[in-house]
UniProtKB/Swiss-Prot annotation:
The keyword Aminoacyl-tRNA synthetase does not apply. Signal peptide: none annotated. SUPFAM superfamilies: Nqo5-like. HAMAP family: NDH1_NuoC. It is found in: Cell inner membrane. Keywords: Cell inner membrane, Cell membrane, Membrane, NAD, Quinone, Translocase, Transport, Ubiquinone. NDH-1 is composed of at least 14 different subunits, Nqo1 to Nqo14. The complex has a L-shaped structure, with the hydrophobic arm (subunits Nqo7, Nqo8, Nqo10 to Nqo14) embedded in the inner membrane and the hydrophilic peripheral arm (subunits Nqo1 to Nqo6, Nqo9) protruding into the bacterial cytoplasm. The hydrophilic domain contains all the redox centers. The lineage of its organism: Bacteria, Pseudomonadati, Pseudomonadota, Alphaproteobacteria, Rhodobacterales. Belongs to the complex I 30 kDa subunit family. It comes from Paracoccus denitrificans. Its main location: membrane. This is NADH-quinone oxidoreductase chain 5. GO terms for cellular component: plasma membrane. The keyword Cell inner membrane applies. NDH-1 shuttles electrons from NADH, via FMN and iron-sulfur (Fe-S) centers, to quinones in the respiratory chain. The immediate electron acceptor for the enzyme in this species is believed to be ubiquinone. Couples the redox reaction to proton translocation (for every two electrons transferred, four hydrogen ions are translocated across the cytoplasmic membrane), and thus conserves the redox energy in a proton gradient.
């Protein structure tokens, strides 16, 4: 494996990608690793180019994840991480998605995207068009909501338990064993008030 690309080489690679895929690339940023902000309609073609282009060769899909920004009209960032073992370099491709938009599936380019897209759907509720098996993968089939959204309550909506009487899993309203506490607030910083060994010498040194 070769050494990682220098910052200058990253800038050259960013320019190469932006020129060759000008209709798909919105902007690039090269700080240690390369980040490409892409259009939703062009993200699949861009990633296919990153895999096949001899100057890129990002042949390994590391991960697909998402970030929730509720205050933004395009609420979600869908983030793709790829690796070029030929250049010892990673790249991050980001695309902004509204809550009512479909993201094209990457399975046709990287079949391993199957489980990553199911995870993003399960945890964020983002839908992928062209995915033949978009089911939950981490939470239960009857789970309500998507737990990595910023508006998902910390207590959840329901709790699950096994009923010996009904001989099945049942869903019930959340029943907290202690009074509910609201943690959504800012606490003022208060420094430590204890005295560590040796601290008593500090006033003496000032005399």
């Amino acid at each position: 494996m070769s050494e990682a690309l220098s910052d200058e080489a990253l800038l050259e690679l960013a320019e190469h990608i932006a020129v060759r895929r000008e209709n798909d690339v919105i902007s690039t940023q090269a700080v240690g690793e390369l980040t490409v902000n892409a259009t939703l309609s062009g993200v699949i073609g861009l990633i296919e180019f990153l895999r096949n282009d001899p100057n890129c060769r990002f042949s390994t899909l590391i991960d697909i994840t998402a970030v929730d920004n509720p205050a933004r009209p395009a609420r979600f960032d869908v983030v793709y991480h790829l690796l070029s073992m030929y250049q010892n370099q990673r790249i991050r491709v980001k695309v902004q998605v509204r809550e009512d938009e479909l993201v094209p599936s990457l399975i046709g380019v990287f079949p391993g995207a199957n489980w990553y897209e199911r995870e993003v759907f399960d945890l964020f509720g983002i839908l992928f068009s062209g995915h033949s098996d978009l089911r939950r993968i981490l939470t239960d089939y009857g789970f309500r909501g998507h737990p990595l959204r910023k508006d998902f309550p910390t207590t959840g909506y329901v709790e699950v338990r096994w009923s010996d009487i009904e001989k099945r899993v049942v869903y019930e309203p959340v029943n907290l064993v202690q009074e509910y506490r609201q943690f959504d607030f800012l606490s003022p910083w208060e420094g430590a008030k204890y005295v560590l060994p040796g601290d008593e010498k500090a006033p003496e040194a000032k005399k």
